[in-house]
């Protein structure tokens, strides 16, 4: 049904009942028709005033917009004509301080509303009957709904359409989120292909170059070929040959290199350092051929040995600092190297379980009781690191002064005082009881974690702000639905906990 915006009254000129007692009926009808025409002319003039008033307002708006546009054009023309790029330079600060121009297109929304209703329509609306005053019952309702909306609700159809559009938009968003999760699950359950192992062609050709009789052991070649992983770790076969050097040793430092360092063994009065076939037999008895050959290759003489230092009196503890020794070297080899010639050796030393147990760290090896001074072979006992142990020896004959102590290393502080297992363990137990020390790195880590939490809260607030309806009009709702349908990424998805995890 078309809405009549302007209606000229009266619509009928000659229709009307004549009053009784009129002698001249023709004259009465003529006068009433003329009066109706005058009323129509007055109504027409009123509508004309409204029409020209609206035209004037529209023209005034166009004039104001044209003037503002002309002012901007004039200012731009002045800047363009007077700008000299060789002399005047635009600073980056000025560019960043000013916002770029953005056109704001205002779409026509809610054309038929109470604010935009024209005057003639407002007059017609005011002439209609008023609805019953049902709004006075609103305070007595439990659901707090407006009582008048049950009788007449101008926004009923719009609210119904809005609810339907928002529901469709939410359904599409959930469908896209479900498809995204399905793709993620399908991507994680795909078959994992096995990576082919790399072949060492050079090693194979080197093995083929040997004759079958001279070819190395097959087990050793396989361990060399297959033992090294991508990180460079050794297999158990190859690691077994280097265990005597690597196990029970201090971390690699300049003081603990592969070359032998000067060692000063302690001897009792009248004792002679052993050398010769007996010590070699003891060495070969407890070490495999491969390990002994490896140690003979590593323990080449690099410098002449220094003389032994004078010993402390009997019953005192060894407090003189000693140079760090290479623990990959057996005591028999050390004594044999430092004493190429001398008196006949004493009887062979007692049997020890293995070469590795002789070099147990001082924290793991229990303390041994001191031997009497009359013992014929003090040095034949199971050896232990030179930084530990209590040696009860007789005063040695006067000799040259002891060598200067080596550079401070991991073992220098240990050799200055006797070591005992229980006090060190107690100190280790007391360390966790100390309060944590706050430094710059811990503060930085705490600041980073706080920043991550703040970022999570900020993103959650942004997501909540996006979920709220921006506008209550048709254009905004439709644009939001189109954006959800044609967007590739799910911008309105829930916050992912995998991002910025601790």
From Swiss-Prot:
GO CC list: cytoskeleton; extracellular exosome; glial cell projection; glutamatergic synapse; lamellipodium; postsynapse; SCAR complex
Composition bias, Polar residues: 223-237
Alphabetically ordered keywords of this record: Actin-binding, Coiled coil, Cytoplasm, Cytoskeleton, Phosphoprotein
Residues in coiled coil: 57-93, 162-206
Keyword Transmembrane helix attributed: no
Ranges of Basic and acidic residues composition bias in the record: 182-192
InterPro entries named among the record's database cross-references: SCAR/WAVE_fam, WH2_dom
Renumbered residue ranges of the record's region Disordered: 169-210, 223-443
Compositional bias ranges of the Low complexity kind: 411-423
One Gene Ontology molecular-function label: protein kinase A regulatory subunit binding
Subcellular location: Cytoplasm, Cytoskeleton
Skewed-composition ranges (Pro residues): 302-312, 341-352, 394-410
GO process terms (BP): actin cytoskeleton organization; actin filament polymerization; cytoskeleton organization; lamellipodium assembly; modification of postsynaptic actin cytoskeleton; oligodendrocyte development; positive regulation of Arp2/3 complex-mediated actin nucleation; positive regulation of myelination
Subunit structure: Binds actin and the Arp2/3 complex.
Biological role: Downstream effector molecules involved in the transmission of signals from tyrosine kinase receptors and small GTPases to the actin cytoskeleton. Plays a role in the regulation of cell morphology and cytoskeletal organization. Required in the control of cell shape.
Family: Belongs to the SCAR/WAVE family.
Record text about domains: Binds the Arp2/3 complex through the C-terminal region and actin through verprolin homology (VPH) domain.
Protein name from the UniProt record: Actin-binding protein WASF3
Organism this protein belongs to: Homo sapiens
